[in-house]
């Protein structure tokens, strides 16, 4: 795939060095192009790209509350359709907190109503903007400020909420997982989401140097390691048909992924083995 050179998210924003969210937005907008309206919930992306009166967005962009990105996007889509502008792409960007927790109700409603929108969850696996608090998307064992490791807790003790399958259960015509570290896979999924009639949901895994604890130069490497260990699986569900879009030639031990991040360094060998066992069971089910 030839990646277009034109940018719709300008440089000079205030993202952390190594920020994965901005990489994802840049790639998505290269596919969607100028004829696009973006909606962003409160979160990292909004804070770093639009400190008043500045903006990094080169397309129409709307900032909304933490919980209603999908609701506003659905309203924008209906308004454009009423004005005879149904060809305009409407995309919502929200973090895992604004998707799996606070915004789940409005997202569910928008998907169920069948609005022709694309919803992209940029998942850094915690509320990074407000201080690295755990979310429903925080993986088992990770240490956050609200699920810390210590005498009374070893870190997050709940499994990661499976948002893609929840969206698939709504009958959404196109659901996919993606990673910023596999740009061609992600961009092809954005293209499919754009071209399909009806709602589309993409769950984008994006390493966070600040919240995960790794060198900013390792963002892409960490994203690849998540996929190569089976900790994050790339797939799509198109009209109910499930398909894995990338299979590692030989899966690496999950320990390589865990050891590369500060948020997992407290885990014992026994706890790491438990996580490996879980990953193995999921991968075996999907024949990865």
From Swiss-Prot:
UniProt temperature dependence: Optimum temperature is 80 degrees Celsius.
Compositional bias (Polar residues): 137-148
Q: Which UniProt keywords apply?
A: 4Fe-4S, Iron, Iron-sulfur, Metal-binding, Oxidoreductase
Q: List the Gene3D superfamilies hit by this protein, alphabetically.
A: 3.40.50.970
What parts of the sequence cross the membrane?
Answer: none
UniProt keyword Manganese, yes or no: no
Q: Where is the composition biased (Basic and acidic residues)?
A: 149-159
Cofactors? [4Fe-4S] cluster
Q: Looking at its record, which EC class is this enzyme?
A: oxidoreductase
Q: Extract one GO molecular function annotation from the record.
A: pyruvate synthase activity
Q: Which InterPro entries match?
A: PorB-like, THDP-binding, TPP_enzyme_TPP-bd
Q: How sensitive is activity to pH?
A: Optimum pH is 10.0.
* Cofactor binding annotation: Binds 1 [4Fe-4S] cluster per subunit.
Provide the catalytic activity annotation.
Answer: 2 oxidized [2Fe-2S]-[ferredoxin] + pyruvate + CoA = 2 reduced [2Fe-2S]-[ferredoxin] + acetyl-CoA + CO2 + H(+)
Whom does it interact with, and what assembly results? Heterotetramer of one alpha, one beta, one delta and one gamma chain.
NCBIfam families named in the record: PRK11865.1
Q: What is this protein called?
A: Pyruvate synthase subunit PorB
Its source organism is: Methanothermobacter marburgensis (strain ATCC BAA-927 / DSM 2133 / JCM 14651 / NBRC 100331 / OCM 82 / Marburg) (Methanobacterium thermoautotrophicum)
Protein's gene: porB
